[in-house]
Regions:
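Mid-domain catalytic core of redox enzymes
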Residues: 1-81, 86-90
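Conserved flavin/dinucleotide-binding core of flavoenzymes
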Residues: 51, 55-162
């Protein structure tokens, strides 16, 4: 199937995670991004999260690791500066002293979901054969988990009925 690209940036912040999202493991989404043009270069990010608020071991010496994602491939230094500016707006803190750790442009990150997409399609292919995957639900980690759960539940219901 066709796919969508995603680029993820990792930064080490110069402040505690508690200063960014009150120490909560919260996915930050820019609601203003979806009120204007989706390709606005000043708002490249779809979401960002303070990884070390939920997994402190992801950074050493009490550092704060931030993961931020945008649709499309954005490998340039200019893109990183736009991301940094967007992060400053989202977290309401200066980001000029944040350390850029890595950028991962992934051309085939998520399956493209053409409309209409049947998220309730059968998970049973044949007797004893079940199928799951993000492309069968919603193209995301959550979609993959939901699809896996639906398949597992269908399999268990079948096994328990015999």
């Amino acid at each position: 199937p066709s796919s969508n690209a995603v680029t993820t940036w990792y930064h080490l912040a110069d402040c505690a995670g508690s200063e960014l999202t009150e120490g909560k493991s919260t996915l930050v989404i820019d609601g203003k991004k979806f009120n204007g043009p989706l390709d606005d270069p000043s708002r490249p990010l779809v979401n960002t999260v303070v990884m070390t608020n939920s997994a402190p071991s992801y950074a050493t010496n009490d550092r704060t690791l931030i993961s931020s994602s945008a649709l499309g491939v954005h490998p340039s230094a200019q893109s990183e500066q736009q991301v940094r500016s967007h992060l400053a707006a989202l977290y309401k803190v200066p980001t000029s002293n944040w350390t850029h750790v890595a950028t991962y442009p992934i051309p085939d990150a998520l399956p493209m979901m053409a409309a209409p997409h049947d998220v309730e399609q059968s998970v049973r292919l044949s007797d004893g054969v079940y199928i799951a995957g993000d492309y069968r639900q919603v193209s995301s980690i959550n979609g993959a988990l939901a699809s896996g759960r639906r398949s597992a539940e269908a399999f268990l219901a079948r096994v328990q009925s015999h």
